[in-house]
Amino acid sequence: FRSIASMPNTLDGEFDLNDELSVEARTILAAAANRGTIDIRANQDSFNSAERFLAVCVESELEQRLLFLQKENPEQTVKFLEGFRQLCQHGLVIHHLQRDFSLSALGFQFARTLDTKDYESSLKFASEIDH
């Protein structure tokens, strides 16, 4: 709880999060703005090594999940994972249990300032998954 207590709780600050966060981090926020649910996934049984990478999965709508992983583009997959790390670093995400995360109150607040249309091309990297 010490780490939660030390998190920023307002967007008023000395720096601009738009400058601090990568486009991948902001894309994750834009995708998560409605539900705020994020988890980290891996497919350890895949033959392809890039499919075994850790990947960010966002519940963008109820029962709609976006997985930011493409075996054909491992570099971009890693950029989205790095974007998630940035969200954690800035207190925009809270860790719950195991692989489960959510936006923090500050994360929801900042996500709602973003225009999803600005991230349409980045969102195309993600694939919709069933579970």
What are these regions, as identified by a protein language model?
Residues 1-42:
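Long, low-complexity, charged/polar intrinsically disordered regions in eukaryotic proteins
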Residues 106-131:
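Short, amphipathic alpha-helical interaction segments positioned at domain boundaries
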Residues 100-104:
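Minor-groove-contacting beta-hairpin "wing" of winged helix-turn-helix DNA-binding domains
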Residues 32-36, 91, 111-114:
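Generic structural signal for hydrophobic core residues of well-folded globular domains
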Residues 70-90, 95-97:
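Short amphipathic alpha-helical interaction segments
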Residues 22-26, 81, 85, 105:
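Non-catalytic, well-ordered alpha-helical scaffold segments
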Residues 40-49, 120-121:
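A composition-biased, non-transmembrane "mature-region" signal
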